[in-house]
Design a protein with these regions (language model features):
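N-terminal cap/lid subdomain of alpha/beta-hydrolase-fold enzymes
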Residues: 1-59
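Alpha/beta-hydrolase active-site loop
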Residues: 43, 60-80
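Alpha/beta-hydrolase fold nucleophile elbow
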Residues: 82-95
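Glycine-rich nucleophile elbow surrounding the catalytic serine of serine-hydrolase chemistry
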Residues: 92-105
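A catalytic-pocket lid/entrance helix-loop region that shapes and gates access to the active site
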Residues: 104, 108-204
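Catalytic histidine neighborhood in serine/cysteine hydrolases
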Residues: 115, 330, 355-371
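Alpha/beta-hydrolase fold catalytic core
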Residues: 187-335, 340-341
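Catalytic histidine-centered segment of alpha/beta-hydrolase-like enzymes
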Residues: 341, 368-378
Length: 379
C-alpha cells in the first residue's frame, strides 16, 4: 500500500499529520505488477500469518529462525507456481535489511534445492546493528547518524548556510568521515584545542547549542537529538521522518513522548490495507496485524552471532558472500535523508565496511524519511 501495489495510500507529502478517515487510496500507475509477480510474505505473527497445528508462533520469532521458515515458503511457492526458471528478487525494508541477506543465504544453502537470487532491494536497511545501536564505547552510530542530524537541522531552519541541502549534506558527510569520526576514535587522546574545534563544527552543522554538544561529549544519541533540536520552539522531531514535528506532554525531559512521524501516517496505512482487502474479496475474521509488541519483545537476538559472543547482528557479509558466488547478484539500496532510524550514511558505511563489491551496488538518496515513498517527489 506504500509503493508497489496496484493501489497505494496517499498521506500528506509535506510531513503534516494524516488526520482521521476517510483516507485517499489511489491507483498506482508505477506498480510493477504488469511485469512481475509481487509476493508479499508476512512473517508468522504478523499480517494474517499464524502458526498452525502443534506449533506456536513464537517458535519462528528470531534472527535465525525467521529466514528459515520464509525460505521454505519461497521454495514451495516457486514449485507450486512452476517458476523455477524465472528471475527472483527479494525486497526488504528496515528489519528487512537483516532478513533479506539471511534469506538469500538460506535459499542458496538448500542441500537439495539451492536457489540463487538475482538481486536484493533494501529500503532503509538495518543490516548492521553496530552502526545503529547507541552503546557506550560504540562510536559507529555517532558518525553514521551525524549527516542526518545536519539534514534535519537544515530542513527546520536551524543552520546558517547559503548552500543547497545536497551540498550541505555532502559537507556534513565529509566532516563526519574526515574530522568527526577520527576525533571520536582518539577518545581522551584528543587535544583540548582539537576537541573544541570539532565540537564547534558539530554545533554549526546540527543546530544544537555548543553547550549541549559539550555536555554530551559530542556523542548525541538520536532520541536526545529529536528532543533537543526544536526544544526552544516547544517541539520534538520524528524518528522515522524528522521533517515531522509536534509538542510533547512536557517540553522538559531528555526524550520525546513518541515518534511523531509514526503518529503522522500509521493510521492511514492500517485503514488502507483493510479497505483494499475488503474491496478485492479477502474475507478474514482476524484483523491484519500490522505490528505486535509481543513479537518485538520476544524476538530472539542470539548473543552468539556467527562465533562472536559479543558481536552486533550483521548480515552484510551475507551480501558479499552472495556476490562472490553469483556473478549476476546485484543490490539496490534506497534511503531517506531525514531517517533517524536507519540513516543513509549508516547504510553507506556498513556496505563499504564488509567486503561488498560496490560496483554491483546502486544507492539512491531521497529528501524524505524511512518510508521515502510517502514523499510524493520521491515516489
Amino acid at each position: 500500500m506504500g509503493v508497489l501495489g496496484p493501489k497505494v495510500i496517499k498521506v500528506p507529502s509535506d510531513a503534516s499529520d494524516d488526520g482521521s478517515a476517510p483516507y485517499k487510496i489511489v491507483d498506482n500507475k508505477l506498480s510493477p505488477l504488469s511485469d512481475a509477480d509481487l509476493v508479499f510474505i508476512d512473517p508468522i505473527g504478523t499480517g494474517y500469518s499464524r502458526a498452525i497445528g502443534c506449533h506456536d508462533s513464537e517458535e519462528f520469532w528470531g534472527v535465525s529462525e525467521d529466514p528459515k521458515i520464509i525460505a521454505e515458503f519461497i521454495r514451495r511457492w516457486i514449485n507450486d507456481n512452476k517458476r523455477w526458471n524465472s528471475p527472483r528478487y527479494i525486497l526488504g525494508e528496515s528489519y528487512g535489511g537483516i532478513r533479506g541477506p539471511l534469506l538469500v543465504s538460506e535459499l542458496r544453502s538448500g542441500s537439495i534445492t539451492p536457489i540463487e537470487v538475482n538481486g536484493l532491494l533494501l529500503v532503509a536497511p538495518a543490516s548492521d546493528y553496530q552502526y545503529l545501536v547507541f552503546h557506550p564505547g560504540n562510536n559507529s552510530p555517532h558518525y553514521g547518524f551525524f549527516p542526518s542530524y545536519a539534514a534535519t537541522a537544515y530542513y527546520h531552519g536551524k543552520v546558517e548556510t547559503d548552500k543547497s541541502l545536497q551540498e550541505f549534506y555532502e559537507d556534513s558527510k565529509n566532516f563526519s568521515l574526515e574530522v568527526y569520526g577520527p576525533a571520536l576514535l582518539k577518545g581522551t587522546r584528543i587535544s583540548d584545542e582539537h576537541k573544541k574545534s570539532v565540537m564547534k563544527q558539530y554545533s554549526e552543522f546540527t543546530g544544537l547549542s555548543l553547550r549541549f554538544v559539550e555536555d554530551y561529549d559530542m556523542r548525541v544519541d538520536a532520541y536526545s537529538f529529536m528532543k533537543e533540536l526544536l526544544r526552544d520552539e516547544g517541539f520534538s522531531v520524528g524518528r522515522l521522518d524528522s521533517r515531522y514535528k509536534n509538542s510533547d506532554y512536557m517540553a522538559g525531559g531528555q526524550y520525546p513522548d513518541t515518534d511523531v512521524s509514526s503518529e503522522g501516517f500509521m493510521s492511514a496505512y492500517v485503514s488502507a490495507i483493510h479497505t483494499w482487502f475488503g474491496e478485492i474479496g479477502v474475507e478474514m475474521k482476524m484483523l491484519y496485524q500490522s505490528g505486535d509488541n509481543e513479537v518485538y519483545s520476544n524476538w530472539k537476538h542470539p548473543q552468539e552471532w556467527k562465533g562472536n559472543d559479543f558481536g552486533y547482528v550483521n548480515t552484510v557479509p551475507d551480501i558479499a558472500r552472495a556476490q562472490r558466488y553469483n556473478k549476476d547478484f546485484k543490490v539496490y539500496v534506497s534511503c531517506g535523508l531525514y531517517d533517524l532510524a536507519t540513516p543513509c550514511f549508516t547504510a553507506e558505511n556498513f556496505m563499504n565496511d564488509n567486503t561488498v563489491d560496490m560496483s554491483r551496488v546502486v544507492f539512491s538518496e531521497f529528501e524524505a524519511g524511512h518510508m521515502m515513498y510517502n514523499h510524493e517527489p520521491s515516489f
